[in-house]
């Protein structure tokens, strides 16, 4: 077992969650020549679960190539992807203010799914959580979008931020909703000798 893992993610929440469970990690971030966002393009007709697993596997392939190209020492690589789904509709990261407002209006008063796939050493686990929101008024949506918090986040929100006040009920993994399901992550790390 190496003394660390590579985290192939730009998410500060994933770093925080790994630190919370005491996993030493080094970042393995995309270079300027990589189009990381292109990996997250939705394929027409793709279901949310298949999308989330495919994107996570693609991120792992890119991270393996990156590690090899940079001549880095061997260590397990952790990749993850979080997807918000309303029915079979994938709500990706908002492209602009109007897109964020559209997503938040769609989620208002609804129960939606948050899927996070995590992959370590070629093994993938999927966490599915159900999140119920109260009805939002136009002012709340406008203020939230103006806060800039929705950007860079699937479904245009961060459960650990201001939108947590709209959450009536969660059935599933809070850490999974944040971006890294700790149960599934530790189950993937145990066979590699990690003890949490």
Residue ranges, per PLM feature:
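A short gly/proline-enriched turn/hairpin at secondary-structure junctions
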Residues: 37-40
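Anionic-ligand binding patches
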Residues: 2-5, 42-196
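A short beta-strand-loop structural module common to alpha/beta enzyme folds
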Residues: 25-34
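N-terminal beta1-alpha1 ligand-phosphate binding loop
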Residues: 2-23
């Amino acid at each position: 077992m190496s003394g660390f893992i590579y985290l192939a993610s730009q998410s500060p929440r994933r770093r925080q969650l790994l630190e919370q469970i005491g996993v030493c990690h080094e970042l393995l971030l995309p270079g300027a020549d990589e189009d990381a966002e292109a990996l997250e393009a939705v394929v027409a007709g793709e279901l949310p679960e298949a999308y989330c697993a495919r994107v996570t596997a693609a991120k792992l392939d890119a991270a393996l190539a990156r590690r090899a190209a940079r001549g880095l020492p061997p260590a397990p690589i952790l990749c993850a992807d979080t997807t918000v789904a309303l029915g079979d509709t994938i709500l990706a990261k908002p492209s602009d203010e109007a897109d964020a407002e559209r997503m938040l209006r769609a989620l208002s008063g609804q129960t939606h799914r948050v899927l996070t796939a995590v992959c370590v050493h070629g093994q993938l686990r999927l966490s599915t959580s159900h999140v119920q929101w109260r009805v939002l008024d136009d002012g709340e949506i406008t203020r939230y979008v103006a806060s800039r918090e929705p950007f860079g986040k699937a479904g245009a929100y961060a459960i650990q931020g201001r939108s947590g006040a709209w959450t009536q009920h969660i059935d599933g993994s809070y850490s999974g909703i944040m971006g890294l399901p700790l149960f599934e992550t530790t189950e993937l790390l145990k066979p590699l000798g990690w003890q949490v």
